[in-house]
């Protein structure tokens, strides 16, 4: 039952977002099976077409040539309207960041799909050898195609602004981490990321502006979200928002529409994270730094999605990813136990306020543990306690 729910939650991400590598872009590709319109028969061989994260801006020129490009009175008005539209189209929070070359990946990539014969007789294009994996032979990845970043070549424009938005994850589901149920809410958010990003891109294109919707690909999301005023970067490497803490997913849409950017905001996250270390204690892979203070990363410290000379707590993404593989589903322990991860109830409002008061910051973690919020912090105790099973 849990696995079926999980599959449904991830369905849009897997079936319609496309082959997006971690380095990401340009755009996305999906592999549906065409239907013969005369016989209504579904073909056994798939075709490759753009997915929801597509960068197809062919309609923009038509809008402009017809003199129908929407002209805003000011960058401020444009920003206000675009954020309002983003939330109407499904975003829970939205902000505007200026395009910053530092956050664009130095190499873009796409998983290389190859045909795999399935038991039902159909051919499925997969980035790994699925029959081999299903027969217990391990995961054999076919590799990645690499692209030099070139906005004008692949999207037809040079970005000026980035619309960054956040989608909330279910509180009750996340607190069961590292269960299949917590994976389901992660998958649901990933699926919604693609849908909402696509809608925002279509909205911009109909106004006569170029757009490139993206998930985790193309550029680093957290620093863009910080620039867009959506929150602060936490010890766990995630964006901490005032409303949801780290319990969300981030997506973004690049555009040539010049928008008034939002300003970064501070509300005590760094000061709190210096003392708390709860996420580091709860990480089963020990991928999160226990150092009291963030540090300026040197080139030798950086992983694929990190920039040198930026100040942050280091996160070992290889350790994190290895536990995901071992666990068989995503782990969200660092999200579940975070003291900023709260819902709108009076006692959680008090706890949220406590995280912003220096004298109470150290106590905020203890309050969580005393009242049993979100289960044991120790990862071994968490799995052995029955908490995950009981929550399901």
Language model features with spans:
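Catalytic cores of enzyme domains
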Residues: 83-84, 89-340, 352-358
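Iron-sulfur (Fe-S) cluster-binding modules
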Residues: 1-101, 105-112, 116-122, 158, ...
């Amino acid at each position: 039952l849990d696995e079926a729910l999980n599959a449904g939650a991830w369905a849009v991400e897997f079936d319609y977002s496309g082959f997006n590598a971690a380095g990401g872009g340009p755009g996305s590709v999906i592999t549906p099976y065409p239907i013969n319109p005369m016989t209504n028969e579904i073909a056994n061989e798939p075709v490759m077409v753009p997915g929801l994260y597509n960068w197809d801006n062919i309609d923009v020129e038509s809008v402009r040539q017809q003199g129908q490009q929407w002209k805003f009175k000011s960058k401020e008005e444009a920003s206000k309207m675009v954020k309002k539209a983003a939330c109407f189209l499904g975003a829970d929070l939205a902000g505007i960041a200026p395009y910053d070359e530092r956050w664009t990946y130095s190499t873009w990539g796409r998983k290389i799909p190859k045909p795999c014969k399935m038991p039902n007789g159909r051919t499925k294009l997969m980035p790994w050898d699925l029959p081999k994996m299903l027969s217990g032979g391990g995961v054999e990845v076919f590799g990645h195609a690499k692209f030099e970043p070139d906005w004008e070549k692949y999207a037809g424009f040079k970005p000026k602004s980035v619309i960054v938005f956040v989608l909330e994850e279910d509180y009750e589901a996340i607190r069961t981490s590292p269960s299949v149920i917590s994976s389901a809410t992660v998958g649901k958010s990933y699926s919604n990321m693609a849908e909402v990003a696509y809608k925002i891109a279509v909205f911009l294109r109909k106004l006569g502006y170029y757009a490139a919707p993206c998930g985790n690909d193309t550029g680093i999301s957290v620093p863009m979200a910080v620039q867009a005023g959506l929150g602060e970067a936490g010890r766990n490497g995630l964006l901490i928002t005032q409303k949801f803490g780290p319990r969300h997913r981030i997506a973004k849409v690049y555009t040539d529409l010049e928008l008034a950017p939002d300003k970064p905001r501070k509300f005590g996250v760094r000061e709190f994270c210096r003392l708390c270390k709860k996420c580091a204690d709860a990480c089963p892979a020990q991928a999160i730094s226990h150092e009291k203070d963030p540090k300026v990363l040197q080139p030798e410290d950086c992983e694929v999605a990190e920039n040198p000379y930026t100040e942050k707590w280091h996160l070992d993404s290889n350790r994190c990813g290895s536990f995901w593989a071992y666990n068989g589903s995503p782990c969200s322990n660092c999200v579940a136990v975070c003291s900023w991860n709260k819902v709108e109830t009076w006692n959680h409002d008090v706890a949220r306020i406590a995280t912003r008061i220096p004298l109470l910051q150290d106590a905020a973690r203890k309050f969580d543990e005393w009242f049993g919020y979100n289960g044991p912090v120790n990862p071994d105790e968490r799995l052995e306690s029955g908490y995950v099973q009981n929550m399901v």
